[in-house]
Each structure stands twice: as C-alpha cells, then as structure tokens.
C-alpha cells in the first residue's frame, strides 16, 4: 500500500471511508475508558474526520496523523479553522486550538513525538493497512509507552472475496497484535446490509467490532 495510492484517492475524492457524522462507537464507548479530560489523544490516519472535533469538544487535546496534505487542509477549511503551520522532523504540523494534525508518514513517528499522548482512537487506520503494514503499525503502537487507553474499530469478513481497503482484521489478529494490552470487545454489529460493495462481491458476513484497549 504505497503513499501514492492514498494521495490519488484524496485527489480523486474517492473517500468513501470518510464518515459524514461522528462515529457512534466513539460516542458510546469513549467515556467508559475513563481518560482524564485534558489528556492528549493520538488519532492515526485521521483523514478529515469529524471525530477529531468531537474529541476536542469533550475537552481532549487531539493529535491526528495523516499522510494526505489535501485531507489536512480540507479539515481546517471545511470547519472554518485557521491553522498555524510549522515543521517537526518529517512532519508538517497544522495546529488550531486543541487540534494538531501532523501531515506525514505514520511510520516516521517516534515515542518522543507523541510523549504527551495517553489515549488512542483508531477507527480507520488498522483496517486501511495490508497485513505486513498492520504488523508494523501495531508494533509502532506498542513502542509508544505513554499511550495507556484507547478505542479501536475493525471489520471482519472473508478477505478472499474482495480486496481491501478496508481490510479484514479478525479478532485473533487484534488480540495477537495487542498482546501486551487488555483487549475487550465492547460492541459488535453485522453491517452487511449497509454495504452494497460487499454484498455485490458475495460476502456473507461483515462484522464491525469496537474494542477497548488498555495497558
């Protein structure tokens, strides 16, 4: 999954993964994590998600990481926010109030960059990555010791019937990748009837799961 793939998706406005409302799992299950108000939350591969605004509105500081500059720029423009832009290492950092979006490759992050992040929210990062990149991504999260609590959303389906993204990430893979964490499935829902692309491909089950992760 090369960066050019995602740059083209954004350039062509092929962003079906972008949700037009705040994620219901986030609203339902984030409060139960008990993350202190004022804490900083890492949101990998954040796009221009409305979830960023929701987290900030709950009193959290938000650090999103996004490869596409188009997505970052669109986020601020579409919400009438004026960002200060600076550089930090390999990243272009856009900041307005309690929201920072770091434009660059997620794998260029290190523990020092996100030392202030104690929370994690991943709705569309893990499922955006093919298997080997998922391994790298989960290893990266494991190497960010400040992060202690988070919410993760996945999809589980027969990958042989249709190519990702979004990719299928089964329960076993989540628990293996987060082996040093306490992993609890907090909600699971069958969403095949809402997903014409998967129905057309002959997929018979499309399970969306939300997990809390803690360590």
Language-model features: where?
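Conserved S-adenosyl-L-methionine
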Residues: 57-61
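Short beta->alpha connector loops
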Residues: 46-48, 131-132
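A short SAM/SAH-binding and catalytic strip from SAM-dependent methyltransferases
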Residues: 106-109, 118-133
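Class I (Rossmann-like) S-adenosyl-L-methionine-dependent methyltransferase catalytic domain
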Residues: 1-37, 48-52, 64-99, 103-113, ...
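Class I SAM-dependent methyltransferase "Motif I" SAM/SAH-binding loop
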Residues: 42-47, 55, 125
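Extended hydrophobic secondary-structure segments that form protein cores and membrane-embedded regions
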Residues: 41-44, 101-103, 120
């Amino acid at each position: 999954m090369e960066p050019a793939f995602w740059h083209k998706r954004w350039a062509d406005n092929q962003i079906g993964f972008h949700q037009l409302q705040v994620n219901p799992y986030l609203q339902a299950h984030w409060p139960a994590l008990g993350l202190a108000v004022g804490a900083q939350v890492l949101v990998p591969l954040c796009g221009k998600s409305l979830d960023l605004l929701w987290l900030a509105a709950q009193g959290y500081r938000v650090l999103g990481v996004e490869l596409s500059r188009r997505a970052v720029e669109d986020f601020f423009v579409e919400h009438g926010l004026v960002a200060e832009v600076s550089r930090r290492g390999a990243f272009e950092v856009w900041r307005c109030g309690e929201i920072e979006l770091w434009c660059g490759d997620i794998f260029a992050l290190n523990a020092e960059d996100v030392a202030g992040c104690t929370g994690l929210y991943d709705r569309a990062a893990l499922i955006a990555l093919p298997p080997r990149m998922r391994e790298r991504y989960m290893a990266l999260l494991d190497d960010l010791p400040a992060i202690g609590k988070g919410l993760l959303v996945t999809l589980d389906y027969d990958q042989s019937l249709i190519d990702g993204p979004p990719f299928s990430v089964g329960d076993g893979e989540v628990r293996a990748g987060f082996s040093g964490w306490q992993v609890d499935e907090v909600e699971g829902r069958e969403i095949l009837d809402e997903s014409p692309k998967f129905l057309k491909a002959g997929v018979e089950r499309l399970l969306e799961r939300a997990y809390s992760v803690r360590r």
